[in-house]
């Protein structure tokens, strides 16, 4: 049981790291001397050093991506907190439904954000020299991992430690 708890805790922390990195790092779109994320657009030198950054546009779709990414981080942090609370207060044989629910919500939020960004980013950057950066890919990787950990939480029963 202890190994199972450590495994699910490791998976949850990995999802949290992926969500934080994908929300913060300026690598959602990468192009010729430019990097773009949810918050700003930056120009870079040939060596990769950031030269100038300016705020991203204020379009509604980008604000919805920003909001859903922030919600995914909040839901995942809340799920981790609830997991620790339930670990010490849940009766033997009880399931971690609330923790699983919030972790699944985090997964659905990050999926929504990445899907909206996928569909709408072409309006923002009509230049075809852009490709998806690693932060965008990390957001998509966080989606199935968050769903998986949420499902594991729902299935998991508390036993004796």
UniProtKB/Swiss-Prot annotation:
One Pfam family linked to the record: PMP22_Claudin
Keywords carried by this UniProt record: Cell cycle, Cell membrane, Disease variant, Glycoprotein, Growth arrest, Membrane, Transmembrane, Transmembrane helix, Ubl conjugation
GO MF terms held by the record: cytoskeletal motor activity; protein serine/threonine kinase inhibitor activity
PTM comment: Ubiquitinated by the DCX(DCAF13) E3 ubiquitin ligase complex, leading to its degradation.
InterPro entries: PMP-22/EMP/MP20-like, PMP22, PMP22/EMP/MP20/Claudin, PMP22_EMP_MP20
Tissues in which the protein is found: Schwann cells of the peripheral nervous system. Expressed at growth arrest of mammalian fibroblasts.
Sugar-modified residues: 41
Cytoplasmic topological domain residue ranges: 1, 92-95, 157-160
Transmembrane feature ranges: 2-31, 65-91, 96-119, 134-156
Localization, UniProt: Cell membrane
GO CC aspect terms: cell surface; compact myelin; integrin complex; laminin complex; membrane; perinuclear region of cytoplasm
UniProt KW Glycoprotein keyword: yes
Extracellular side: 32-64, 120-133
A GO BP annotation: response to endoplasmic reticulum stress
Membrane topology, from the record: Multi-pass membrane protein
Disease link: A defect in Pmp-22 is the cause of trembler (tr) phenotype. Trembler mice show a Schwann cells defect characterized by severe hypomyelination and continuing Schwann cells proliferation throughout life.
Membership in a protein family: Belongs to the PMP-22/EMP/MP20 family.
Function description: Might be involved in growth regulation, and in myelinization in the peripheral nervous system.
Protein name: Peripheral myelin protein 22
Organism of origin: Mus musculus
Organism classification: Eukaryota, Metazoa, Chordata, Craniata, Vertebrata
